């Protein structure tokens, strides 16, 4: 993948993970001086910080959705969409269908990890219901917004560009993975979000979405992914 496309993926991943990264802190230094090894899976959440982490994460997600909506009418943001498209397409030598499969990768990974003995927060039935709720909210919201906004795709194929459904699906799956394994290791969530950000970058590489579509889809996916867990927790 070209440098510009990778840079966009990195920006998306950093923005989406800002709340998660700020909620992680290492244990106090209570080990003996002779201890030289450290397991990253043992990172713990600071209670004072983790209390505010969901609010911070949802604020970041809401900001991404708001950016997507603003770009529908704001000329400077539309111009940024066009310049980003031009830069990416200048180096796009081929199209790929990897994004059609990568959008599901974090969710598939959750079930694969459980199958090999790396247990998440919920059993098969509960996590399936949680993910089902998230997907239902995400899919319904995405279809509704596409029909209401009628933003033309960069390739001119139709008027269903905003928000990116692939990106929303990928980030909902990434948030699902993060929530399932946040008490095991933060690196599972980071991997899920990296896959989601790559999905968004590939949608632009394939000339199917504007940058603002990707930002809006990412924010929507994070929000609906988290909503599935919140809905189940209240039952």
Q: For the regions a protein language model found, what residue spans apply to each?
A:
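Extracellular loop and loop/strand-boundary signature of outer-membrane beta-barrel proteins
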Residues: 92-94, 122-130, 157-160, 205-207
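Hydrophobic alpha-helical transmembrane segments
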Residues: 57, 128, 132, 190-191, ...
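Membrane-embedded catalytic cores of phosphoryl/pyrophosphoryl-handling enzymes
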Residues: 146, 151, 155-235
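Mid-length scaffold segments of soluble, non-membrane domains
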Residues: 129-153
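Lipid-exposed faces of alpha-helical membrane segments in multi-pass integral membrane proteins
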Residues: 62-66, 102-112, 133, 137, ...
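N-terminal secretory signal peptides that target proteins for export/translocation
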Residues: 1-2
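N-terminal targeting leaders of membrane proteins
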Residues: 5-13, 17-119, 130-131, 148, ...
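Juxtamembrane helix-break-helix junctions at the cytosolic face
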Residues: 115-122, 180-183
């Amino acid at each position: 993948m070209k440098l510009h496309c990778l840079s966009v993926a990195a920006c998306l991943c950093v923005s989406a993970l800002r709340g998660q990264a700020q909620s992680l802190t290492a244990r106090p230094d209570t080990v003996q001086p002779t201890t030289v090894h450290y397991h990253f899976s043992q990172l713990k959440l600071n209670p004072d910080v983790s209390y505010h982490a969901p609010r911070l994460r949802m604020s970041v997600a809401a900001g991404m959705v708001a950016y997507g909506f603003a770009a529908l009418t704001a000329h400077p943001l539309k111009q940024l969409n066009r310049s980003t498209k031009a830069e990416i397409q200048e180096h796009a030598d081929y199209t790929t269908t990897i994004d059609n499969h990568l959008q599901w990768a974090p969710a598939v990974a959750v079930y694969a990890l459980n199958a090999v003995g790396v247990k998440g927060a919920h059993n098969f039935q509960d996590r399936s219901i949680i993910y089902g709720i998230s997907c239902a909210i995400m899919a319904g919201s995405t279809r509704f917004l596409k029909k209401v906004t009628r933003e033309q795709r960069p390739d001119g194929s139709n008027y269903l560009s905003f928000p990116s459904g692939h990106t929303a699906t990928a980030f909902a799956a990434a948030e699902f993975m993060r929530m399932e394994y946040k008490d095991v290791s933060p690196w599972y969530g980071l991997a899920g979000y990296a896959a989601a950000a790559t999905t968004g970058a590939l949608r632009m590489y394939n000339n199917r979405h504007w940058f603002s579509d990707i930002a809006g889809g990412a924010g929507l996916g994070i929000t609906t992914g988290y909503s599935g867990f919140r809905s189940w927790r209240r039952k």
